[in-house]
Amino acid sequence: RLIYNSYVADMAKYAGKGDSVKIAEAYDSLPVQLARENNKFQYKLIRTGARSSLYGASIDWLIQSGIVLKCTKCEQGLMPLAAYEDLSSFKLYFSDTGLFNSRLQLTKQSLAAARQYMGALTENYVAIQLKANGYKLNYWTSTATAEVDFVIVQSGEVVPIECKANIHVKSKSLDSFVKRYDIKQSIRLSMRNFGFENNIKSVPLYAAFCV
């Protein structure tokens, strides 16, 4: 809570009173944004009538200050990945998973019962680890319902990453991406141990920093 309060104080100090209100509103919407099955950032979830022209600068401030991490949608799993980015579609993650947990007001005891948030918390944790390793954050969705949590570039190759909060790891979305773009190797982060099967590298969540 103290860290959150210091962030809010910094918003007022460096962004000015008027802008800091919108910045705080955008930041406070993150738990709602991430808890949704479709967790693409939606301005309307900040408040009724909110739109990019009103809050775009506030989002940029949060990103530039390092308070949030931006993950941009890529429309194709092809190189160069940056050429296929849809800059209007993105997700925002907390730069600190502890802050996300604090904003959800979850305790160690209640965390196990809040299963609807486990996927979001897992994604947020992985986003932080990938960013710390210097990767640009992207994700992919098909025109249907398929979605790959993260898409990165390793040694000039597109590598999709799937995050699972448990040991159940089957993913039609990952399979669809691999077949569509002839991907040589994928990464799956889950509660399972290290392994390699069907060109999928299995990495336990605790070792996400190894990616």
Regions found by a protein language model. Give the residues of each.
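Short hydrophobic-aromatic micro-motifs
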Residues: L92-S95, I161, S202
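Short catalytic-loop micro-motif centered on adjacent basic/acidic residues
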Residues: N138-Y139, P160-C163
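Structural motif
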Residues: E157-V159, Q185
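Catalytic cores of nucleic-acid endonucleases
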Residues: A165-L205
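C-terminal helix of von Willebrand factor
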Residues: L205-V211
